[in-house]
Each structure stands twice: as C-alpha cells, then as structure tokens.
Amino acid sequence: MEGSYILSTDVINEKVTRTSPGNYALGYVKDNKFIVQYVGRADKDVASRLKQHVGEKYKRFKFSYATSPKAAFEKECENYHDFGGTEGKVDNKIHPDRPVYANWKCPKCKIFG
C-alpha cells in the first residue's frame, strides 16, 4: 500500500488519482510506524470510499489500487485477518462482506463457502 497520508479530502484528491477498485487501511503513526485501526475496500472508486471516512477518528490512510472488485474483496479479507480482525485488533466489527451478486470466498478462512 502507498502512504501513509493525512486523511483529508485535499490529500485524497492529490494522492488517489485514478477511479479504481482498491483497498485501504486507516490509522495513525506512532514511533514512525503506521498503526492499522480499520481496513476497507472499494469495489469501484477507492478515493470516494476514503472520503467517506474524513472527519472520523482516523488520522491517516494507506491505499492500493486493485485490478477488480474481486481482487479488492480478497485483499480486504487478507488485511482483515493479517491485522487481527478476528481477535478484535481493528475497528471492523464483522468479517468483510462480499457483494450480493458474488459467490466469492475469503482466501484465508473460506467464509461464505
């Protein structure tokens, strides 16, 4: 992922320049290390999705573009597990969901299988 950057509309406009599916992590920096508090994805436009978080408690973000909505879903699932979502270490309350039209499975835990 690219970043971390300050979570503001101006910075998102400057750094996230393509309309694309993608993934992101929200958090803060402590001792020069990015601390992940929330992971997410956008199936169509990662910049628009990030802007929905402006004004929340999160100070910074990292992001990456994805090649497809499915790739974004799979990466969000991996991030959720890698950053401790199942142990409550991130603010995500539930496992990432898939779009209603999709029959995708989580690459880590095979939920929805």
Regions found by a protein language model. Name each.
Residues 1-36, 41-113:
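Boundary/linker segments flanking structured domains
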